[in-house]
Amino acid sequence: MNIINKILVLFFAIILNTNTAFSAEKWDMALAYGASNFHSANATEFAKNVSDKSGGKLTIVTHPGGSLYKGGEIFRAVRTGQAQIGERFMSALGKED
């Protein structure tokens, strides 16, 4: 194998590995309730299903118990792009525009 072929093989190996590394995406999901609460359990199951159905291209990491944002801050955090996804009762958003 001459030097040009070796360089081409190395180049394509780097490109393929770089593409694979950047194709997976991770989202943080803010949850107000503790991990044992059924809302958080449902969110965890949802996150698992998303990862399975997307073939691992999208992984959602749940943050229960207000560990990422407190309940009253979740809507603002998602709205402003600080968190990609969050769970909050719709009735708590009654005064939001």
Predicted regions and their residues:
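Boundary at the C-terminal end of the N-terminal hydrophobic targeting segment
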Residues: 21-23
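Bacterial N-terminal signal peptides
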Residues: 6-18
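Short, glycine-/small- and polar/acidic-enriched structural segments
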Residues: 26-97
